Amino acid sequence: MRFLYPTFTVEKYDAYLTEMIPHNYKQIAVFEQDVCVGISGLWSGTKLWSGKYMEIDNFIVHPDHRKKGVGKMMTDYVDAKAKETGCTMIVLDAFTENFTAHRFYYNQGYVPKGFHFLKIINKEGLS
């Protein structure tokens, strides 16, 4: 997590997971010799406009392991899981300035569809 959110503490991570897991949140990870080199959260749900969907949340590959197939392995797993569970689509967010992620997602078949708008209510509470 520290590569995406450098100030994120283990305590905050644990507290968030405790809150998220009861709401259909799962995580997948890739390990190399007991070291986590890739991790992502997954949500699934149903929306009126899409039906059942799967959402990738906080997709992170350790910088030393990028361009080695770890991200592809993870998206392939998500693709298979989404098909297996009857989802119509997979969705995700990427920070607007994260051009490396944009290129990766384009290469995996993802396309931008609209904008993700947000309104900050409590800036201090952000990760």
PLM-predicted stretches and their roles:
Residues 45-56, 66, 112-113:
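A conserved beta-turn-beta hairpin within the catalytic core of GNAT-like acetyltransferases
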Residues 91-101, 118-120:
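Conserved beta-strand-loop-alpha-helix junction that forms the acyl-donor binding cleft
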Residues 59-61, 94:
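Hydrophobic adenine-recognition pocket in adenosine-nucleotide-binding enzymes
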Residues 83, 111, 115-127:
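Terminal substrate-recognition subdomain of acyl/acetyltransferases
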Residues 87, 96, 105-115:
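Conserved acetyl-CoA-binding loop of GNAT-fold acetyltransferases
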Residues 1-51, 120-121:
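Acetyl-CoA-dependent GNAT
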